[in-house]
């Protein structure tokens, strides 16, 4: 397959290098990734300033470019410029830390894959769910095995897979729902050496979903969480209720 690999941790990150090198053992791999950390940039794109792209070296088997853009920019550039619109699969990752619950709305990793889904290209976001001790190689090897088994024709149009891999021994995988996992944010006030106040966002994770088949519970129990998601955000149940009342 011709595979595009991107991420939001930057082209220098270990996660994308390990993933690209392992995938290139069996596939034709192209890497187009941000030239610096772009975590939590969501699905932002660059439209008011130029995008710069520079060829870089990862390995002999991988064609790689860094860009000044976001993960979504990287996918657009790669598809239209680097790969001449011939892409069989897009993989975003391996991310350092989980992308579960409401995190996916902020995640550049997920948005890179979602950009591919919006083009109706098979796309996967993959994260090593342990931020402090990420197992990039374990996540990448899981993905390689998964690709040999999974039938992408089972996915609805414009749908991607969000994969979170636990650290340590993997018991198997589960197809899961996006959870209600979210953050309770607060801001720490600090003072610069020049006497100016600034703020640093902090937070505590909230995991209170009462459903059993959600992403973080699978990971907590040692299973890889695989969640099919799409860019269509309409709340269908609420829409039906509103129409019944007001139409």
UniProtKB/Swiss-Prot annotation:
Result of altering residue 9 to N: Loss of activity
Disulphide bond pairs: none
Top EC group: hydrolase
Compartments it resides in: Cytoplasm
SUPFAM superfamilies associated with the record: SurE-like (SSF64167)
Temperature dependence: Optimum temperature is 80 degrees Celsius. Active up to 95 degrees Celsius.
Keywords carried by this UniProt record: Cytoplasm, Hydrolase, Magnesium, Metal-binding, Nucleotide-binding
EC id: 3.1.3.5
Regulation: Inhibited by vanadate and tungstate.
pH dependence: Optimum pH is 5.5-6.2.
GO cellular component: cytoplasm
Cofactor note: Binds 1 Mg(2+) ion per subunit. In contrast to other surE homologs, is essentially inactive with other divalent cations.
GO molecular function: 3'-nucleotidase activity; 5'-nucleotidase activity; exopolyphosphatase activity; metal ion binding; nucleotide binding
Biological role: Nucleotidase that preferentially dephosphorylates 5'-GMP and 5'-AMP.
Protein name (Swiss-Prot/TrEMBL): 5'-nucleotidase SurE
Organism: Thermotoga maritima (strain ATCC 43589 / DSM 3109 / JCM 10099 / NBRC 100826 / MSB8)
